[in-house]
From Swiss-Prot:
Key enzyme in the regulation of glycerol uptake and metabolism. Catalyzes the phosphorylation of glycerol to yield sn-glycerol 3-phosphate. The lineage of its organism: Bacteria, Pseudomonadati, Pseudomonadota, Gammaproteobacteria, Enterobacterales. The keyword Cell membrane does not apply. Sn-glycerol 3-phosphate binds at residues 14, 84-85, 136, 246. The gene is glpK. Glycerol binds at residues 84-85, 136, 246-247. NCBIfam families: glycerol_kin, PRK00047.1. GO terms for biological process: glycerol catabolic process; glycerol metabolic process; glycerol-3-phosphate metabolic process. This is Glycerol kinase. ATP binds at residues 14-16, 268, 311, 315, 412. PROSITE patterns: FGGY_KINASES_1, FGGY_KINASES_2.
């Protein structure tokens, strides 16, 4: 009898590193998770220690195999999914980072972005990379590191320094520096990659003065990139066979592989992606055009809207405002009041993402009267997640010309029934919550498993996509539109709050 085989997904997120073991029926066998430190050197700056990312991720891999009581020779393949855009530069020789990882949320490169706009680069960037000029993406972060670490640009030119997003960093460490690769989905988030020619863009590299020698090789999201022998008992070399940025992995894990299928992930931020097939749809409504995975991990395109603050705004209620002691309590308190009593919370703590793209917006609470209590504010904070999702969905429907009939949802906050019902109410659309919530890890596992023949094709996976609960709209159109118009008014007043040089 042959030994049972499994797939491991490594899910390197913004606040924690996780490892998930899955069996052939896409059941979760074991999970290991470790949080790591968030570093805030200045207001609006966010960093991680790349060595801590590696330490937490590698230890979860060892731990998850021990928990499942399986040896490394029972692992058919490893798939990697990661927080996107987060930028690491390290020495080729030693594997040591020259600076902390600059995280996707970090706004320190706003001035570099203003300069790109002044240089008339907006249309070029939108047309060739699919992105908008914003500190969110990796390109300006790489430039910042090269500008601020003495001698680094010259070293990069000599081939002594390497750049990578988190996937690239992990694979470099897992293969002891033998493999320097990324996949199309992660490359498409750097603002350095041409999504039409599927190659690094020389004009962008020149504009940001980034030597091409630093950049990883870009490969498909489902193929064998290299082998690793990390991971507990048994010294087998395990193929690393799938890579996708977290949102594209979730889209694949939800099996949204056909044109017009969409999902929203409610994590630290909120991310809605709609697969547009083999056609790159240019957005006229502040969305991103990005690369997604087709049925076999090949290049498809997607429209994406990013909301920076979703679960993070609930953490704010807990950690800074001390209104709740546990994120799960937010649902209980929100349902203790019948509405928000006219209050809107705009959680623009680090600016606003799609479709506004205003790094100078700041958080605000509007509509406060004497009768407002903490429950109203908790409820309004939860509702803000649903309103921001509607902002994005409206833009998507306008760009693609596709009316969405159902939204698939995943991420930590989907356990909140109040939020899911309000989401359906405010969209006027069915919201489908899957049985397996770990869709990001699932996507990475599927991509890796397909690459090594563990699963033959997506048809094999379709029956595993069980919808656990469907939420349907429960309010009238007039009420829906009235509430949403209040949100629009609140956002308008939060825009451009921080002064900046014109």
């Amino acid at each position: 009898m042959t030994e049972k085989k499994y797939i491991v997904a490594l899910d390197q997120g913004t606040t924690s590193s996780r490892a998930v073991v899955m069996d052939h029926d896409a059941n979760i066998v074991s999970v290991s998770q470790r949080e790591f430190e968030q570093i805030y050197p200045k207001a609006g700056w966010v960093e991680h220690d790349p060595m801590e990312i590696w330490a937490t991720q590698s230890s979860t891999l060892v731990e998850v195999l021990a928990k499942a009581d399986i040896s490394s020779d029972q692992i058919a393949a490893i798939g990697i999914t990661n927080q996107r855009e987060t930028t690491i530069v390290w020495e080729r020789e030693t594997g040591k980072p020259i600076y902390n990882a600059i995280v996707w949320q970090c706004r320190r490169t706003a001035e570099i972005c203003e300069r790109l706009k002044r240089d008339g680069m907006e249309d070029y960037i939108r047309n060739n990379t699919g992105l908008v000029i914003d500190p969110y993406f990796s390109g300006t972060k790489v430039k910042w590191i090269l500008d601020h670490v003495e001698g680094s640009r010259e070293r990069a030119r000599r081939g002594e320094l390497l750049f990578g997003t988190v996937d690239t960093w992990l694979i470099w460490k897992m293969t002891q520096g033998r493999v320097h690769v990324t996949d199309y989905t992660n490359a498409s988030r750097t603002m350095l990659f041409n999504i039409h020619t599927l190659d690094w863009d020389d004009k962008m590299l020149d504009a940001l003065d980034i030597p091409r020698a630093m950049l990883p090789e870009v490969r498909r999201s489902s193929e064998v990139y290299g082998q690793t022998n990390i991971g507990g008992k048994g010294g087998t070399r395990i193929p690393i066979a799938g890579i996708a940025g977290d949102q594209q992995a979730a889209l694949f894990g939800q099996l949204c592989v056909k044109e017009g299928m969409a999902k929203n992930t409610y994590g630290t931020g909120c991310f809605m992606l709609m697969n547009t097939g083999e056609k790159a749809v240019k957005s006229e409504n502040g969305l991103l055009t990005t690369i997604a995975c087709g049925p076999t991990g090949e290049v498809n395109y997607a429209l994406e809207g990013a909301v920076f603050m979703a679960g993070a705004s609930i953490q704010w209620l807990r950690d800074e405002m001390k209104l709740i002691s546990d994120a799960f309590d937010s649902e209980y308190f929100a349902t203790k009041v019948k509405d928000t009593n006219g209050v809107y919370v705009v959680p623009a703590f680090t600016g606003l993402g799609a479709p506004y793209w205003d790094p100078y917006a700041r958080g605000a609470i509007f509509g406060l009267t004497r009768g407002v209590n903490s429950n109203h504010i908790i409820r309004a904070t939860l509702e803000s997640i649903a309103y921001q999702t509607r902002d994005v969905l409206e833009a998507m429907q306008a760009d693609s010309g596709i009316r969405l009939h159902a939204l698939r949802v995943d991420g930590g906050a989907v356990a909140n029934n109040f939020l899911m019902q309000f989401q359906s109410d405010i969209l006027g659309t069915r919201v489908e919550r899957p049985e397996v919530r770990e869709v990001t890890a699932l996507g990475a596992a599927y991509l890796a498993g397909l690459a090594v023949g563990y699963w033959q094709n997506l048809d094999e996976l379709q029956e595993k996509a069980v919808i656990e609960r469907e939420f349907r709209p429960g309010i009238e159109t007039t009420e829906r539109n009235f509430r949403y118009s209040g949100w629009k008014k609140a956002v308008k007043r939060a825009l451009a709050w921080e002064d900046h040089e014109e």
